[in-house]
C-alpha cells in the first residue's frame, strides 16, 4: 500500500486469522505452544482465570490521557474516543480472557526482553531457533516510511514492528525494531549490540516531550553497562 494508518487492533486480528486458517489453533494457543513454553516465557494472549492473581492492576495518571484530548488537529484522538480508551480496561476478566493479538498480551519485562534478545541475535541462540534468518529479515524489512495519515507523524514500520525511533535520544538507532506502548512501556531489539530490552509498567504516565523518565533512566543504565 501507499499509505499508513496506525491501528492498535486490526493488525493482530488479520495476522491471527491467518494462523487460524493455516494452523487451526487460535493465536494465543499457537504462541503458547510454539514460542512461550519452549522458551520458558511468561506471556499470554488469553489469560486463564487461574492466572489472574499474577496480573498487574493497571492505573493511569490523568496526564496519560492528554494525547486523546489533544484537540482536533488530527483524526488520531477520534480513533481512541469511540468509545474513549480507558487504562483500567485491562483489569477486567473479559479483557484478560479474550484474544486480541495486537493489544492484550500479558507479559513481564524479562520475557519480552528475552524474546527480543533472541531476535537481536538473529533469531537463533544456543542452537535453538525462534525465527530463521530469512524470516527475520522479511519481518523487519521496512514496509512504510512516511507520514501516518491519521496522526500526521513521521512513521517507519516493518511487519508489525516500529523501526528506529523506539528508545529515546542517544539510544535511538535505525536498526532497532520493536514497539512502544501507552503510558511508557516499550520492548525492542538492538541487533548491533545483540540486545533485547523491555520496560513495562502498571502505572501509565503522560509526557510533554514523549519521553518516560523511568524508561530513560533504565536505558541510560543499560547502555552505560555495555
Which sequence ranges carry the predicted segments?
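Short, surface-exposed loop or secondary-structure junction motifs
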Residues: 1-171
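Short amphipathic alpha-helix initiation/capping segments at coil-to-helix junctions
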Residues: 105, 150, 154, 178-179, ...
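Short, gly/Ser/Thr-rich active-site loops of penicillin-recognizing serine hydrolases
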Residues: 121-124, 140-147, 207-226
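Short, hydrophobic/aromatic-rich segments at coil-to-beta transitions
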Residues: 171-177
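Short, small/polar residue-rich loop motifs at catalytic or cofactor-binding pockets
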Residues: 182-183
Amino acid at each position: 500500500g501507499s499509505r499508513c494508518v496506525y491501528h492498535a487492533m486490526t493488525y493482530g486480528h488479520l495476522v491471527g486469522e491467518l494462523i487460524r486458517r493455516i494452523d487451526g489453533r487460535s493465536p494465543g494457543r499457537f504462541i503458547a505452544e510454539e514460542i512461550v513454553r519452549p522458551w520458558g516465557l511468561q506471556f499470554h494472549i488469553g489469560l486463564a482465570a487461574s492466572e489472574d492473581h499474577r496480573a498487574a492492576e493497571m492505573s493511569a495518571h490523568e496526564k496519560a490521557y492528554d494525547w486523546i484530548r489533544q484537540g482536533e488537529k488530527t483524526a488520531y484522538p477520534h480513533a481512541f474516543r469511540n468509545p474513549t480508551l480507558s487504562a483500567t480496561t485491562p483489569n477486567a476478566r473479559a479483557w484478560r480472557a479474550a484474544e486480541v493479538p495486537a493489544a492484550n498480551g500479558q507479559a513481564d519485562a524479562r520475557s519480552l526482553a528475552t524474546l527480543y534478545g533472541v531476535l537481536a541475535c538473529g533469531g537463533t541462540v544456543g542452537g535453538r531457533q525462534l525465527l530463521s534468518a530469512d524470516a527475520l529479515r522479511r519481518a523487519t524489512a521496512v514496509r512504510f516510511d512516511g507520514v501516518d495519515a491519521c496522526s500526521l507523524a513521521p512513521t517507519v514500520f516493518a511487519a508489525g514492528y516500529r523501526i528506529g525511533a523506539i528508545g529515546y535520544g542517544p539510544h535511538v538507532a535505525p536498526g532497532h525494531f520493536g514497539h512502544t506502548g501507552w503510558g511508557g512501556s516499550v520492548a525492542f531489539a538492538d541487533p548491533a549490540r545483540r540486545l533485547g530490552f523491555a520496560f513495562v509498567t502498571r502505572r501509565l504516565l503522560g509526557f510533554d516531550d514523549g519521553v518516560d523518565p523511568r524508561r530513560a533512566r533504565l536505558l541510560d543504565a543499560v547502555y552505560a553497562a555495555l
